Amino acid sequence: MTLTAKKSCAHPWTTNVARCALRRASTILIAVLTAGFAQNAIAAALPQTTSKSRAEAVLDSMPKAKTIQQAEISPDGKLVAWISEGKIHLELVEVLRGATGKEISVPGGLEARELAWSPDSQKVAFIADENSAIPASQLWIADVKGLDSHKLANLRGYVSTPSFSPDAKMIAVLLIENMPRKAGPLVPMTPPSGLMEEKIYEQRIATIDVVSGELKQVSPPDMYVYEYDWAPDGKSWAVSAAKGSGDNNWWIARLYTVDAISGTMREILKPKLQVAVPRFSPDGQSIAYISGIMSDQGSTGGDIFVVPVSGGEARNLTPGMKASATWLKWTGPNQILFTENIDGNSGIATVSGASGQVRQVWNGFEMLSADGWGIQISLASDGNSSAVVRQSISSPPEVWAGPIGAWRKLTSLNSTVKAAWGEARNVHWTNDGTGIQGWLLFPKDYDTSKKFPLIVVVHGGPSAACMPRWSTADGAASAMGWFVLCANPRGSYGQGEAFTLRNVKDFGGGDFRDIMAGIDAMAKEYPVDLDRLGIHGHSYGGYMTMWAETQTNRFKAAVAGAGLSDWLSYYGENDIDEWMVPFFGASVYDDPKVYARSSPINFVKNVKTPTLILVGDRDGEVPAPQSFEWWHALKTVGVPVEFVVYLDEGHTISKPQNRHDYDLRTLAWFEKWFAAGEDEHKTSTAFSSRN
């Protein structure tokens, strides 16, 4: 599994990384385990000499760009609000006049997140998080004319997704009351104790009166609501929801309507696959949504469907589309505008709700976002004026606004930040007649007369993709003098739903061969040193790293972050086993063979590749025992191995000191083994070990 948050921040080229919050920590708390010993966490992190290694010097020299969490255009298209670096202010910029930005301060030094405009474009609501051990937030409203702001409500628990009602009298939010941690399977899990599942925290829709601040929980207490959208008349919501554990049951969520007064739920649809982004049509008679095989909430990709609110059969508007829809909004009675991953690029298109005709509006060699997460834009009521956060491998994030495709840059937050790495190309190759796409980052000082090592980066997911986003981690690898290939093998987004479905019941099969074919294709085209290959990934990428080691000895070194070594034991260890059934076709108890044949642990005696293993000790998505199993197995078979456990970290390694340590150890591991003598680690051709 991935990743972002809403899926994973595990690797910066994946679609699911930018939402990850960086939290302050006074010390680096890590445990380092090597092939023969364990040592004190703090001592392990301290440098042994006063001089920096080359890897450390290169990583520390990388440009520091400011991040942008969200950009939202007002419904009238005249103003844009955004949040940068989770700071305690919001900036408003007039799109048409280009006026200087204004700030809305939050008293008490609180961090602001998740903006929402009022329908009349006169107010902005946002969430401010209190500095407390367990989630506690405040809901604020600011008047954009006078910039006066006031606190509307105190909220105990995890709150997200504020949205004004069509008449602006209410603000709806998603609230998990008294939740002891942030929501989602990516954050550090609460250590287990006592009776399991004695308390299940459900995420409910709550409304807050904009005058009195009165809070009312509306949706049923036994349902976990993942997403919602106001009906045009304000009387109901379209929601995706499921009973039971919210972390686990997103993969079996159904489509409902919820009465905004009584909370009565009515089922509209039981989808065949996962469902995301439900949106009412302008007349309130239909609901559009995205459905496809998805491995993580928030990492959205699939086709666009429409279903009557009254129920009935859903229509696929985009069957056979060679792209993955990621977000949508109705722009007319029979027109839907959507964003997409199209061949690894960001795209914007429209589809007719009547005929299903798709029209490409824009696409580019860059990453577009509006919420700091996936491919998405913020769209005004006219269906054309928009705000976006634009970034690419060579350009750091900035806020842009204007007509789609004719945006004007509004911010200069990173105007002095320049890429310190080589160029990047959108590359293609074939395997077994299947076209595969990826991104190739060149060494900084590229010279066609020389050969350079190559690192393969495998994204999380598997339903995700490498995207052309700003990444200092990959930039550092380029600055070290290495190629970086981030492949999008079968199972990824960007080539259509049929392509994403192609690794179902085939983990480690066609996807692995696609990656290896990519290495050979790059070596034919560019001066790749095939005696110095590396592989690295986190989550599903960590699994693929472990799997690759059992299938070939071509790699000189490997780094497996939050990897899965044994699918059978993993099924009983993780908090999200529902995700596995769509991908493996059955539970592990009904078809253990399909899990066993894709488990690296069953072929561990083939491994010769020196391996670095990294994991958070409170990872609920890919629990640390999976990494312990791999570490123990590699020690037993005599493979050089180091194992790092980050304390109080979840699936995402998010604390700044730990994130730096993660990236530094990764670079240093490849540097060490790329420099090793050929007699220490011979490369060889691939061998077959799978039944």
Model regions and ranges:
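Residue-level detector of Asp-centered blade-edge/turn motifs that repeat once per structural unit
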Residues: 75-76, 119-120, 166-167, 232-233, ...
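A flexible loop/linker signature enriched in serine peptidases of the S9 family
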Residues: 84-90, 106-112, 125-140, 154-160, ...
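Non-catalytic accessory segments flanking enzyme active sites
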Residues: 69, 172-174, 181-183, 198-205, ...
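Hydrophobic beta-strand positions that form the internal "hydrophobic ladder"
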Residues: 77-80, 124, 168-171, 237-238, ...
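Short loop/turn segments that connect beta-strands within beta-propeller blades
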Residues: 94-98, 143-147, 209-213, 259-263, ...
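Cap/lid segment of the alpha/beta-hydrolase catalytic domain
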Residues: 405, 411-531, 536-539, 569-582
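Beta-strand-rich domains and repeat architectures in extracellular enzymes and scaffolds
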Residues: 60-88
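Active-site-proximal cap/loop segments of hydrolase catalytic domains
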Residues: 486-691
